[in-house]
């Protein structure tokens, strides 16, 4: 079905099948669709509301068009959809180093700031990591540092057909939620944060359709795309071969002190670099450390390295206190810049 017919179908209020969504995405990612058609499809989907099948179909094509990173071991990604406008520091990036220090191999996929001041690419670059790596160099980082970073705009060249349209129409589209589903290393273990609670179930079902091994879809209290300390957090546990399981968890459930959202606030790149280093070095013992531990615990559960969040929290603490998390950062800086791990 040509993309023009799919636009008409969506405008009439009908959902696309997973295969139809993949066909539309194929036209977009190969440059066959005109900018007007891309804008119309994205806007119509946004107004109708994307289904899990539509999200999964488009994600399959985006994965297929990405430059692949080959690595023969189970990989974990920690990322979110963004868009929460909370101005927190780089929680999932900090948690990634803590999880790596506890033995998970982390293939982090991210970009520069979109809705925030400092994205994962920005803070990693500020920390001294070379973010402009090719696939072979990322695989080397995974092997020698236990963590690697894939700069989204470098690994998704087909996005050149979409970028100008997204900027011109100026609304959030399905592409804002496809990024976390399109890891170039095909990480099958994942923590995926969503700012919109209505999106959590859709993303969980999409991950299930995409054949994820183990993922935690999380929505933080107060509308964050991270687990927070301020109230009940939604978690949807998605495992291959199992029905997704939904539950809530608070900081107090795990013995962590509650803290308001304001306690997690970050700033520009220099501020967030100092925060991340402070946590990993053990100097920062504030609520920022606790929220990083909580999200690292979730990452370790998703990586199948922890039995539950309490066990994950215990391992995350050891990663920080032993210096293993900081060592992963230092090693990534060295290896990404061409040194030996």
From Swiss-Prot:
Group of enzyme by EC: transferase
Binding-site residues for Mg(2+) 2, renumbered to this chain: 225-226
Gene Ontology CC entries for this record: cytosol
BP GO annotations: L-tryptophan biosynthetic process
Recorded catalytic activity of this chain's protein: N-(5-phospho-beta-D-ribosyl)anthranilate + diphosphate = 5-phospho-alpha-D-ribose 1-diphosphate + anthranilate
Binding site for anthranilate 2: 166
GO molecular function, one term: anthranilate phosphoribosyltransferase activity
Cofactor(s), names only, from the UniProt record: Mg(2+)
UniProt keyword Nucleotidyltransferase present: no
Cofactor binding: number and manner: Binds 2 magnesium ions per monomer.
EC number per UniProt: 2.4.2.18
Pathway(s) the chain acts in: Amino-acid biosynthesis; L-tryptophan biosynthesis; L-tryptophan from chorismate: step 2/5
Binding, Mg(2+) 1: 92, 226
Residues the entry annotates as binding anthranilate 1: 80, 111
Listed InterPro entries: Anthranilate_Pribosyl_Tfrase, Glycosyl_Trfase_fam3, Glycosyl_Trfase_fam3_N_dom, Glycosyl_Trfase_fam3_N_dom_sf, Nuc_phospho_transferase
Keyword match Metal-binding: yes
Alphabetical keyword list: Amino-acid biosynthesis, Aromatic amino acid biosynthesis, Glycosyltransferase, Magnesium, Metal-binding, Transferase, Tryptophan biosynthesis
Binding, 5-phospho-alpha-D-ribose 1-diphosphate: 80, 83-84, 88, 90-93, 108-116, 120
Subunit composition and interactions: Homodimer.
Family annotation (NCBIfam families): trpD
Family: Belongs to the anthranilate phosphoribosyltransferase family.
Role, per record: Catalyzes the transfer of the phosphoribosyl group of 5-phosphorylribose-1-pyrophosphate (PRPP) to anthranilate to yield N-(5'-phosphoribosyl)-anthranilate (PRA).
Protein name: Anthranilate phosphoribosyltransferase
């Amino acid at each position: 079905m040509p993309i023009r017919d799919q636009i008409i179908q969506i405008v009439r209020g009908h959902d696309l099948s997973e295969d139809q969504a993949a066909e539309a995405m194929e036209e977009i990612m190969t440059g066959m669709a005109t900018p007007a058609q891309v804008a119309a499809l994205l806007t119509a989907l946004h107004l109708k509301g994307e289904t899990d099948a539509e999200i999964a179909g488009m994600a399959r094509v985006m994965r297929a068009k990405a430059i692949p990173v080959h690595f023969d071991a189970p990989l974990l990604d920690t990322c979110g959809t963004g868009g929460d406008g909370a101005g927190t520091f780089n929680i999932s990036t900090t948690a990634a180093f803590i999880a790596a220090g506890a033995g998970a191999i982390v293939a982090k996929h991210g970009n520069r700031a979109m809705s925030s001041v400092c994205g994962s690419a920005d803070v990693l670059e500020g920390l001294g990591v070379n973010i402009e790596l090719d696939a072979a160099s990322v695989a080397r980082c995974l092997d020698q540092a236990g963590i690697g970073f894939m700069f989204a705009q470098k690994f998704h060249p087909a996005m050149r057909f979409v970028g100008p349209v997204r900027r011109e129409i100026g609304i959030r589209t399905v592409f804002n939620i496809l990024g976390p589903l399109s890891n170039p290393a095909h990480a099958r273990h994942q923590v995926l944060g969503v700012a919109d609670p209505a999106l959590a179930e859709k993303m969980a079902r999409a991950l299930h359709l995409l054949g994820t091994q183990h993922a935690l879809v999380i929505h933080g209290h107060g509308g964050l795309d991270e687990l927070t300390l301020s109230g009940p957090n939604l978690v949807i546990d998605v495992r291959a071969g199992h029905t997704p399981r939904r539950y809530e968890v608070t900081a107090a459930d795990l013995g962590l002190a509650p803290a308001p959202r304001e306690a997690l606030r970050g700033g520009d790149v220099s501020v967030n670099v100092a925060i991340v280093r402070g946590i990993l070095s053990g100097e920062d013992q504030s609520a920022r450390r606790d929220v990083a531990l909580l999200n690292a615990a979730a990452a370790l559960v998703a990586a199948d390295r922890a039995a539950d969040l309490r066990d994950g929290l215990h391992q995350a603490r050891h990663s920080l206190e032993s210096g293993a998390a900081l060592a992963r950062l230092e090693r990534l800086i060295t290896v990404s810049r061409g040194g030996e791990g």
